[in-house]
Amino acid sequence: GIGSLINSTEGVLFAEMAVLSDDSTLKSITLSDGTGGNRVIINYSNASNRLTADVRVEAVGQAFMQTYSYTITNFLKIALKYKENDFALWVNGTEVATDTSGSTFSANTLNRLGLDNGASGELLFGKVKQLQVYKTALTDAQLTSLTT
């Protein structure tokens, strides 16, 4: 598995991607333990041009962020930073949402990268140019550079 490449306590999930259609169906990319209960998720949501980011620990929401500001069928550079009390969603060089209250996972919880919701649902039908996982929460300057 890839568990050794993922830090469960902090990190960044980054993707440069576009969905095939804005059809109001859920499409997701996650770091998880194979369930929907422990996950870091970037989600093309069930509303037109809605992009969400969510962190769940033991099925309890720790952070939730969203934006409606982008055309999701265009390629977007998206980064979700997760660290205890420090969550942020970045899109195309801009920090679009933050959450400053929430926990992360115990060490070695996350061990799966999936183009789904963490439990084999909400499959991502899209085009992916880049997919990266960072084991530390990057700085704002690093996230700006990564997503620009």
Language model features: what each stretch is:
Residues 1-10, 65-69, 119:
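Short surface loop/edge beta-strand patches of beta-sandwich-type extracellular domains
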Residues 11-21, 114, 121-148:
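Extracellular, beta-strand-rich glycan-interacting domains
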